[in-house]
UniProtKB/Swiss-Prot annotation:
Single Gene Ontology BP annotation: visual perception
Organism: Mus musculus (Mouse)
Encoding gene per record: Guca1a
PROSITE patterns recorded: EF_HAND_1, EF_HAND_2
InterPro entries, per the entry: EF-hand-dom_pair (IPR011992), EF_Hand_1_Ca_BS (IPR018247), EF_hand_dom (IPR002048), Recoverin (IPR028846)
Name of this chain's protein: Guanylyl cyclase-activating protein 1
Length: 202
């Protein structure tokens, strides 16, 4: 699968923002390459449940665009750009990669349910008006057009964009700007601990 950030990197963030993020990145990661362990520490994501840990690993892999096992500064900026300023289509492509845990190009019900549960463990701003199971059932009922129990990228992109409720819910559940803003305010030590470490209730 191609780089979802093609043509989108540093230019999406202002020079001031880039300087601030570069300073923070190099202060906390002097090697210039962020490992998965450092990624967890950097974002304050520690003492997580197994499902939440799997989600963090999947998020790391989607941001590691060249698949070398590290996130360098350019990948880091591209990720921030996507999270903070990405267009709907870009974000949906990234959401799809995040949900497609086994990387086979389709999302099945178990993959979606696993990630939704994990997201709710980590992200206290995510929508909780429906249980994870109810939300997963709703997604498949609305956008699994051919009824094969799997969502292709095309089904996912078209279906979500046509359904404002799904689009709004997915956007809220995967809104990492709260974590990013806390990082900007130097509060990352507290993020992802305490009650967020509890296993998500379906």
């Amino acid at each position: 699968m191609g780089n979802i950030m093609e043509g989108k990197s540093v230019e999406e963030l202002s020079s001031t923002e880039c300087h601030q993020w570069y300073k923070k990145f190099m202060t906390e990661c002097p090697s210039g390459q962020l490992t998965l362990y450092e990624f967890r520490q950097f974002f304050g994501l520690k003492n997580l449940s197994p499902s939440a840990s799997q989600y963090v690993e999947q998020m790391f892999e989607t941001f590691d665009f060249n698949k070398d096992g590290y996130i360098d500064f350019m990948e880091y900026v591209a990720a921030l750009s996507l999270v903070l300023k990405g267009k709907v289509e870009q974000k949906l492509r990234w959401y799809f990669k995040l949900y497609d845990v086994d990387g086979n190009g389709c999302i099945d019900r178990d993959e979606l349910l696993t990630i939704i549960r994990a997201i709710r463990t980590i992200n206290p701003w995510s929508d909780s008006s429906m249980s994870a199971e109810e939300f997963t059932d709703t997604v498949f009922a609305k956008i699994d057009i051919n009824g094969d129990g799997e969502l292709s990228l095309e089904e996912f992109m078209e279906g979500v964009q046509k359904d404002q409720m799904l689009l709004d819910t997915l956007t809220r559940s995967l809104d990492l700007t709260g974590i990013v803003r806390r990082l900007q305010n130097g509060e990352h030590e507290e993020a992802g601990t305490g009650d967020l470490a509890a296993e998500a209730a379906g």
